[in-house]
Each structure stands twice: as structure tokens, then as C-alpha cells.
Amino acid sequence: MRHRMWIFSALLTLFATGCAVNNNYLRPEDFADYLRRDGIRVESVRKVPPDPFRASDAAAVKVADSEIGVYKYDTTAGAQRRRLKWIENEKRLYINGIPYPVRIYGSFVFFGLERNPAKRKILRTIEKFN
């Protein structure tokens, strides 16, 4: 019985690591390149301070006259990994106590998608961002 449990837990661990998204090596600015490759017109890309959301890096990508915040959390650092896990559970970030919905994919949090006219296309690109 113990042998079966060990095999089951080993297979479960193998499956979980195989399904995880590993995009920690990418930069927030790289997301703009992925959008362009998918035929989405990127109007501008600029660095923004990552401090408000305690991220390690951040950029604002303008698509369809609307900016998307792309925040990277370095998952090799324990504090960043815990913060990202908290955001995954909450599915929102707060600015002055006001909650805003976010999308999480791998090491990245995407902010400001809800009102973007190209939201569906951008979401498809997010799923390829690794």
C-alpha cells in the first residue's frame, strides 16, 4: 500500500510540474512582442514602477487606446512567490482600497484588461506567453 501511495505522489508531482507555466525568464516588455506576433497593434510600451503592487518589474503596454499593466513577480524569490500566490487566490489587486480584477499567467499579472476593446485577442496571447 505504501509503495502505491509513493508512486501516486511521484506521478502527481510530475504532472503538476509539467503543467506549471514557466515564463519567469521573460520581461514585461516581451509581452508586447508576443502581441505583435499575434497581429495585435501595439501603440506603445513603457516601463512603470513595479512598487505599487510589490512586483519585481513592470511595463505598460498600450493596445486599442487603452493601457495594460504587465507586472512580473520573480518566482525564484520566496516573498515574490508568496505575493503572487496571494494575488492568484484573490484574483484582484487594490489601489487605494478599490479592488481591480487581474489575470495571472505564470510569473505575470495583467492589469486593466476588463475595459480593453481587444480583450479577447489579448487573452489568447496571454495563454501563449511562455
Question: Language model features by range: what are they?
Answer:
Residues 1-7:
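Bacterial N-terminal signal peptides that target proteins for export
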Residues 17-18:
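C-terminal motif of bacterial Sec signal peptides marking the signal peptidase cleavage site
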Residues 30-62:
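N-terminal secretory signal peptides
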Residues 35-42, 77, 90, 126-130:
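Sec/Tat-exported extracytoplasmic proteins
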Residues 52-53, 80-101:
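An anionic, turn-rich surface loop/hairpin at beta-sheet edges
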